[in-house]
């Protein structure tokens, strides 16, 4: 049976065990106490007899209470059960009647003067108590040794059971332990003890089943996917197979596995390694505050450096070519603009020259025409005057002129 702790106000624990059967024969004192119906004898009897009251097997008592006399009550009161259920019911009636009428005043009933002289060594003089308290494992004997070291009588008196105590008001059947003589039932109880602990840790049954299913699946997967160490030679073969298939993006685990043809290598190994190879190849640069890089093997480190260096060089060359191309285009555009500007300047200069030459020619032609017209007019006038004179001279010659008289001065 499971032990039930009963907590009192004095922080004393009450435990019950079913593994210690009582085989002690009842003493004459215990028989006399069990047969008596006088309730006042509970306080008038010595404490040793009261102790045997609880430890007697003749009346079917709960068992013996392992307590001390010189140092007060023990902190742990152990109850051992009996086999017969009828004896338990018989003692329950007698003990409940006797326990109800205990005095409520602890100070007056349990003073230092009223204690009997043989109370201090009752566990040594009474052989029944010694036989009941000595157990095979020696646990209770050690408790007696610890109890003898204490001498606080007031604390011992405060922990006596009175009628005002809530423990007395409860039913004694709760304090009695029901045991069965069948060994199969005991085995079942011992097997069922750790079940409450499992329920406390994992309340739901579905949660309890999950670890079992996961472990079975993990074991199955472990048999199919065993861990494998990738050596540099295996990695080189893997890289060659990936390159032969057209790169890491086009390569498939099945194709790589066929090309490698390594004994013990499965598709799961190739798949995981291919995924790691892809992530290592296209891994972004770590930030300043980011996590440190994963340690790579020398071969992977070299390949990653080569890839990074090649990518950097090609990117730089591509950018340089683009810049040079843009510069050439800009120079060509500037050259064309300069040529057009020069042509336009030449054309304008020619237009200005033509305009100037046309103005000069126009003025010269007008002046020449005027001079020519004047000369022609003069010539025509001269030509007209000359014939008139000639004709007059001719007429004068032809006609006779009269003789003029000479005048004498």
UniProtKB/Swiss-Prot annotation:
The modification Phosphoserine is found at residue 399. GO terms for biological process: cellular response to high light intensity; cellular response to phosphate starvation; circadian rhythm; regulation of DNA-templated transcription; regulation of monoatomic ion transmembrane transport; response to arsenite ion; sulfate ion homeostasis. Its main location: nucleus. Residues 253-278 bind DNA. GO terms for molecular function: DNA binding; DNA-binding transcription factor activity. Residues 192-224 have a biased composition (Low complexity). Keywords: Coiled coil, DNA-binding, Nucleus, Phosphoprotein, Transcription, Transcription regulation, Ubl conjugation. Gene3D superfamilies: Homeodomain-like. It comes from the Eukaryota. Induction: Only moderately up-regulated by Pi starvation. It is found in: Nucleus. One of its GO terms (cellular component) is nucleus. Sumoylated by SIZ1. Sumoylation controls phosphate deficiency responses. Residues 1-42, 86-108, 178-226, 358-409 are annotated as: Disordered. Residues 222-282 form the HTH myb-type domain. A motif (LHEQLE) lies at residues 327-332. Residues 314-334 form a coiled coil. Homodimers and heterodimers. Interacts with SPX1 in a Pi-dependent manner. Does not interact with PHL2 or PHL3. Belongs to the MYB-CC family. PANTHER family: HTH MYB-TYPE DOMAIN-CONTAINING PROTEIN, MYB FAMILY TRANSCRIPTION FACTOR PHL11. This is Protein PHOSPHATE STARVATION RESPONSE 1. It comes from Arabidopsis thaliana (Mouse-ear cress). The gene is PHR1.
């Amino acid at each position: 049976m499971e032990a039930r702790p009963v907590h009192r106000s004095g922080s004393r624990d009450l435990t019950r065990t079913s593994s210690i059967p009582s085989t002690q024969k009842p003493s004459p004192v215990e028989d006399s106490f069990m047969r008596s119906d006088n309730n006042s004898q509970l306080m008038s009897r010595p404490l040793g007899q009261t102790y045997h009251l609880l430890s007697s097997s003749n009346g079917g008592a709960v068992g013996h209470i392992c307590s001390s006399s010189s140092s007060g009550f023990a902190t742990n009161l152990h109850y051992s059960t009996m086999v017969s259920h009828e004896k338990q019911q018989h003692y329950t009636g007698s003990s409940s009647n006797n326990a109800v009428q205990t005095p409520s005043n602890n100070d007056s009933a349990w003073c230092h003067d009223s204690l009997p002289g043989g109370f201090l060594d009752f566990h040594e003089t009474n052989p029944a108590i010694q036989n009941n308290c000595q157990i095979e494992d020696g646990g209770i004997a050690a408790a007696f040794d610890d109890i003898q070291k204490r001498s606080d009588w007031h604390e011992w008196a405060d922990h006596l059971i009175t009628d005002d105590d809530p423990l007395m008001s409860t039913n004694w059947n709760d304090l009695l332990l029901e045991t069965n003589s069948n060994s199969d039932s005991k085995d079942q109880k011992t097997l069922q003890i750790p079940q409450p602990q499992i329920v406390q840790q994992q309340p739901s049954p579905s949660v309890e089943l999950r670890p079992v299913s996961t472990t079975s699946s993990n074991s199955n997967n472990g048999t199919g996917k065993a861990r494998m160490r990738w050596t540099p030679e295996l990695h080189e073969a893997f890289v060659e197979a990936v390159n032969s298939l057209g790169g890491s993006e086009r390569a498939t685990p099945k194709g790589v596995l066929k090309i490698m043809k390594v004994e013990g290598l499965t598709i799961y190994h190739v798949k995981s390694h291919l995924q790691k190879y892809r992530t290592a190849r296209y891994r972004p640069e770590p930030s300043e505050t980011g996590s440190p890089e994963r340690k790579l093997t020398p071969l992977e480190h070299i390949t990653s450096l080569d890839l990074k260096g090649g990518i950097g060089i090609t990117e730089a060359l591509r950018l340089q070519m683009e810049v040079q191309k843009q510069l050439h285009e800009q120079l060509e555009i500037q050259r064309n603009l300069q040529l057009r500007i020069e042509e336009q300047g030449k054309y304008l200069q020619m237009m200005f020259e033509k305009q100037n030459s046309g103005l000069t020619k126009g003025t010269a032609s007008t002046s020449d025409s005027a001079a020519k017209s004047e000369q022609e007019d003069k010539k025509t006038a001269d030509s007209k005057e000359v014939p008139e004179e000639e004709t007059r001279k001719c007429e004068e010659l032809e006609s006779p002129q009269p003789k003029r008289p000479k005048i004498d001065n």
